[in-house]
Amino acid sequence: MKTFSVAVAVAVVLAFICLQESSAVPANEEQELEQQIYFADPEMPVESCKMPYYMRENRQGSPARCRFCCRCCPRMRGCGICCRF
């Protein structure tokens, strides 16, 4: 019975991995999808997506430049606030 439980668990894990891989989007298609999403609304100007830098202090007290951007900082996987210290 224990062997059967292990076999079922392995089958479930393998099925989950296969589903995850099949639902992944290749990198070049992902960029095209993002461009379609960003430029799909003609009424929204591109400038409204770009937020200017604003000042923020880091732990040492020196000012840091932060802005909202997409994939502009290392290890960033989407859009968010990026601060370069």
From Swiss-Prot:
Signal sequence, renumbered to the chain: 1-24
Keywords on record: Antibiotic, Antimicrobial, Cleavage on pair of basic residues, Disulfide bond, Hormone, Secreted, Signal
GO cellular component, one term: extracellular region
Propeptide residues, chain positions: 25-64
Segments traversing the membrane: none
Tissue: Expressed in all tissues tested, with highest levels of expression in kidney and lowest levels in liver. Intra-peritoneal injection of lipopolysaccharide results in increased expression in heart, spleen and stomach, but not in kidney or liver.
Any one Gene Ontology BP term: defense response to Gram-positive bacterium
Annotated InterPro entries: Hepcidin
A molecular-function term among this protein's GO annotations: hormone activity
Main location: secreted
Family: Belongs to the hepcidin family.
Job of this protein: Seems to act as a signaling molecule involved in the maintenance of iron homeostasis. Seems to be required in conjunction with HFE to regulate both intestinal iron absorption and iron storage in macrophages. Has very strong antibacterial activity against the marine Gram-negative bacteria V.alginolyticus (MIC=24 uM), V.fluvialis, V.harveyis (MIC=12 uM) and V.parahaemolyticus (MIC=6 uM). Has antibacterial activity against the Gram-negative bacteria A.hydrophila (MIC=6 uM), E.coli (MIC=24 uM), and E.coli BL21(DE3)plysS (MIC=6 uM), and the Gram-positive bacteria B.cereus (MIC=24 uM), B.subtilis (MIC=6 uM), C.glutamicum (MIC=3 uM), M.luteus (MIC=3 uM), M.lysodeikticus, S.aureus (MIC=6 uM) and S.epidermis (MIC=12 uM).
Record-linked PANTHER family: HEPCIDIN
Name the record gives this protein: Hepcidin
Organism annotation: Larimichthys crocea (Large yellow croaker)
